[in-house]
Swiss-Prot record:
EC number: 7.6.2.10
Residues covered by the ABC transporter domain: 4-235
UniProt subcellular location: Cell inner membrane
Descriptive protein name: sn-glycerol-3-phosphate import ATP-binding protein UgpC
Protein source organism: Brucella abortus biovar 1 (strain 9-941)
Subunit note: The complex is composed of two ATP-binding proteins (UgpC), two transmembrane proteins (UgpA and UgpE) and a solute-binding protein (UgpB).
Length: 351
């Protein structure tokens, strides 16, 4: 196991197109860190730089106590799990697991020990003599993970490994990956664009935007105190409602909100908004009259899509099956403690 340290890492193409913009990050020994962000934010490029598959333009990358800027990928003591499994189709599962170890001249007895240990942990013992074409997508992904595990590396690097799986299997596999990582205690860096994967798997999240870090923290820290409007809308589903401060009475802050000078944006998560009853005095953060435009039933709860009097959209959540009708007018509100305030630059200005 090893910590991974990135110090002011930059990556440019053609000398003037910078895609990684001075990223500094320390990943602790045994930590599971998830790099998350939209397409094109630089998360996969950053992972490939750690792996040695992409060169860096400036800065340093250390694995353990060793700077690995100029170290070949095979010598970095890392193992990578890819989206496309990367299995040899003509080999059995056992042969796929053993291939890398044989290339490193690992003794036969040690190879068998590692294969048996990984196969048991991944519950693929009954598939060892099968070839990849005889396996399901989930089973193939377990084999790909097994090939990484038998390496017994200093760190695991996961590049969107669940993207090819269906929704049910993704849920199962993310639980298995996290369980295995905890049992092995291996430092892990995991890339995904799926914020649900990120929230449920990470010890810490690193939210990337256009090649730089927007925020680093635990999933609950990023959810409850997003550092910017970008993080606020990226983390959480449905995303946080963001509304510019209006001059009209369509949507006004309540008495408990202290406003910063200059332009500002209010943020409220859908689950923090409730429909107000007559005489309700608890909505001291904001309250507004809205018109219901759509109702989505998603099992144990409903999402109501509404419009403010100035036409701006607002989404909020109610428990169970909503009894409200399209075009119905309702008053909604939230407590001051649930209102997030962001300045004109999009950065958080309130606790």
């Amino acid at each position: 196991m090893s910590k991974i340290v990135l110090d002011n890492v930059r990556k440019s193409y053609g000398g003037n197109i910078e895609v990684i913009k001075g990223v500094s990050l320390e990943i602790a020994d045994g930590e599971f860190v998830v790099l998350v962000g939209p397409s094109g934010c630089g998360k996969s490029t950053l992972l490939r730089m750690i792996a040695g598959l992409e060169s860096i333009t400036s800065g340093t990358i250390s694995i353990g106590e060793r700077v690995v800027n100029n170290v070949e990928p095979a010598e970095r003591d890392i193992a990578m799990v890819f989206q496309n499994y990367a299995l040899y189709p003509h080999m059995t599962v056992r042969e796929n697991l053993a291939y890398g170890l044989k290339n490193r001249k690992t003794p036969k007895e040690e190879i068998e020990r590692r294969i048996a240990k990984a196969a048991k942990a991944l519950e693929i013992e009954q598939f060892l003599e099968r070839k990849p074409r005889q396996l399901s997508g989930g089973q193939r992904q377990r084999v790909a993970m097994g090939r990484a595990i038998v390496r017994e590396p200093a760190a695991f690097l996961f590049d969107e490994p669940l993207s090819n799986l269906d929704a049910k299997l993704r849920v199962q596999m993310r639980v298995e990956i996290k369980r295995l990582q905890r049992s092995l205690g291996t430092t892990s860096v995991y890339v995904t664009h799926d914020q649900m994967e990120a929230m449920t798997m990470a010890d810490r999240l690193v939210v990337l935007n256009a090649g730089h870090i927007e925020q680093v923290g635990t999933p609950i820290e990023l959810y409850e105190k997003p550092a910017s409007t970008f993080v606020a809308t990226f983390i959480g589903s449905p995303s946080m409602n963001l509304l510019q401060s209006p001059e009209s009475a369509a949507w006004q802050p309540g008495r408990a909100i202290t406003l910063p000078s200059g332009g500002y944006t209010f943020g409220v998560r859908p689950e923090d908004i409730r429909i107000l009853e007559e005489g309700d005095q608890d909505a001291d953060g904001f309250n507004a009259q809205v018109r219901i435009e759509a109702v989505e039933l998603v099992g144990a709860e409903s999402y109501i899509h509404a419009a403010l009097s100035d036409g701006k959209p607002l989404i909020f959540r109610v428990a169970g099956r909503s009894t409200h009708n399209i075009d119905e007018m309702v008053r909604v509100g939230a407590s001051a403690t649930d209102v997030h305030i962001f300045g004109a630059d999009g950065r958080r200005v309130s606790d």
